[in-house]
């Protein structure tokens, strides 16, 4: 990898559910309070990546998490940084290890020496979501949504709240990022 020409990201996906908007409501004792809820099975999948060096967060909505959308998100990151090599740290989801992702890496890295690869993917420790700073971003957004449940009258508004929580702070100073930084001194 050439110095100054590498971007490193932690990447993950998140499923936002209509039920994530649930909060608490006060009502008279021994009286049932009814709150209208539309389809409780509604969901939106988001892919996100945090730049290890700047803390900038990139968010994109997709229909679901699978190999196709994983590759679509990787291509999105490539378009943002066309002249840089990308290093992606992520969990061991099946669609991160097989199928379309493998085909994509073979295509973009074809004929290149390993140190010249355009995209390098590194798996985090298995069953250790606490290692991925993107999980902290998801938690922040999923905490924000029920804190504002009074305006979450539709799933569209739930999604808007989720995105607003992330976009209100597009640069994340996750303490976990520091443990992955390499000292240049």
Regions picked out by a protein language model, each given a short descriptive name:
Residues 1-185:
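Short functional hotspots at interaction and active-site rims
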């Amino acid at each position: 990898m050439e110095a100054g020409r590498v971007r490193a990201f932690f990447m993950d996906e998140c499923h936002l559910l209509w039920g994530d908007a649930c909060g608490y409501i006060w009502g008279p004792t021994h009286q049932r309070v009814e709150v209208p809820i539309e389809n409780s099975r509604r969901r939106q999948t988001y892919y996100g990546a945090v730049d290890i060096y700047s803390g900038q967060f990139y968010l994109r909505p997709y229909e679901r998490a699978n190999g196709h959308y994983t590759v679509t998100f990787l291509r999105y990151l490539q378009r943002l940084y066309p002249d840089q090599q990308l290093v992606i740290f992520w969990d061991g989801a099946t669609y991160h290890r097989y199928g379309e992702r493998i085909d994509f890496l073979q295509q973009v890295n074809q004929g290149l020496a390993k140190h010249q690869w355009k995209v390098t993917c590194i798996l985090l420790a298995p069953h250790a979501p606490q290692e991925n700073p993107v999980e902290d971003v998801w938690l922040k957004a999923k905490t924000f949504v029920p804190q504002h449940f009074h305006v979450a009258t539709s799933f569209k508004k739930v999604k808007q709240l989720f995105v607003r929580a992330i976009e209100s702070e597009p640069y994340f100073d996750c303490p976990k990022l520091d443990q992955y930084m390499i000292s240049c001194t």
